[in-house]
């Protein structure tokens, strides 16, 4: 019996470690991603928390930016029937990395070789994400040679998974560099927000003739939004964001599925970036926000029976955010919000939690870690 159990354990371990094969296939009208020989359109989210909820909304894949928790994320994804775009965090010039320093570049490549060797046979692995926004505020195009060396190692040692690299938005210069210097990149990936509508037309125009993915997308970025007269960007409310998620997916992602292999919505989790609510699909207390309803609708194709309330109006002192609200600190002012429930939905009581938070003084770029702004109490 003991011998039989040992053999069975070895068999299960072997089965678990067999890689699923992902391929990019040229079709009569574009490209298709296939997993184990079957079409696989990526309906993904950027982030790896609440995987049961990811499955519940009809998503099929998660994206990471680095490998700090790779084993845990891959294993949990496998248990939940999800795949993983595993990010290899290639160092940024803007953080001090010198791509003219061959010793440092070689050490980085050697590290990623060990990572690739370790995880290449995991059954939840879908795609290798070789670098994220290495083009942001950079001056040295040698970074693309480093991207190519990593991607080539993937192709040399892992026949089962394609490679992608991710740029901050889409422009002709980076498309030209990747086309010329990175022949082992299979898929071009773009992080894009308000400019997402230009991607389908621009990507071929800029010289990339292969497939692409949208690896971050969501509301308008804080750099793309209207500002107050004192220069602070105005965040969309959750209802406005829900409409944006729905329309951008339907019009610019799904509609171009002959060349766009899918997407990863940003951000599945909570994050302080300009504000604590701008990009996160969950509050810092892990409460889901209204845009998740939009993702469930587009991923499943079904209308929700119990969606979140719609915000009709939100005002302070009878003014909305775009009115450049100025209030005296010693005054007392009314704040009002009007919501609407979907048909056949009723609630006995709505709870409102009002918070006043100072404007952030730790605003950075590229998603770098920011300190939370101070909440005003009393």
What are the residue ranges of the model-derived segments?
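Substrate-binding clefts and catalytic carboxylate motifs of secreted carbohydrate-active enzymes
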Residues: 27-28, 35, 39, 44, ...
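Active-site neighborhood of phospho(di)ester-bond hydrolases with catalytic His/Asp-centered motifs
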Residues: 165-166, 189-190, 212-216
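Solvent-exposed segments in extracellular or luminal domains encompassing
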Residues: 374-378
């Amino acid at each position: 019996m003991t011998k039989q159990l040992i053999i069975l354990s070895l068999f299960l371990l072997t089965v678990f470690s067999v890689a699923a094969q992902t391929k990019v296939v040229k079709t009569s009208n574009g490209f298709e991603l296939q997993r184990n020989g079957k079409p696989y359109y990526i309906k993904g989210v950027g982030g790896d928390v609440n995987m049961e909820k990811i499955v519940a909304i009809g998503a099929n894949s998660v994206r990471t930016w680095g490998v700090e928790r790779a084993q845990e994320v891959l294993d949990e994804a496998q248990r939940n029937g999800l795949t993983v775009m595993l990010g290899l965090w290639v160092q940024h010039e803007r953080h001090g990395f010198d791509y003219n320093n061959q010793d440092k570049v070689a050490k980085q490549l050697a590290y990623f070789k060990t990572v690739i060797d370790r995880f290449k046979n995991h059954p939840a692995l879908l795609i290798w994400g070789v670098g994220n926004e290495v083009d942001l505020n950079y001056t040295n195009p040698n970074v693309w040679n480093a991207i190519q060396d990593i991607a080539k190692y993937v192709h040399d040692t892992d026949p089962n998974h394609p490679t992608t690299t991710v740029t901050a938005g889409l422009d002709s210069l980076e498309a030209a560099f990747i086309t010329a210097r990175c022949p082992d990149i299979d898929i071009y990936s773009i992080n894009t927000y308000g400019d997402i509508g230009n991607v389908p037309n621009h990507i071929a125009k800029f010289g990339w003739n292969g497939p692409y993915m949208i690896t971050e997308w969501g509301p308008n970025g804080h750099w793309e939004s209207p500002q107050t007269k004192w220069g602070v960007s105005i965040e969309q409310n959750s209802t406005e964001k829900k409409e944006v998620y729905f329309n951008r997916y339907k019009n610019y992602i799904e509609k171009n599925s002959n060349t766009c292999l899918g997407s990863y919505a940003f951000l599945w989790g909570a994050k302080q970036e300009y504000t604590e609510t701008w990009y996160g699909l969950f509050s810092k207390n892990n409460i889901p926000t209204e845009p998740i309803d939009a993702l469930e609708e587009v991923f499943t194709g079904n209308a929700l029976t119990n969606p979140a309330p719609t915000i009709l109006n939100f005002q302070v002192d009878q003014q909305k955010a775009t009115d450049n609200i100025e209030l005296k600190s010693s005054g007392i002012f009314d704040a009002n919000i009007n919501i609407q429930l979907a048909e056949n939905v009723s609630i006995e009581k709505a709870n409102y939690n009002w918070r006043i938070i100072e404007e952030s003084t730790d605003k950075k770029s590229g998603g770098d870690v920011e300190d939370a702004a101070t909440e005003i109490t009393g």
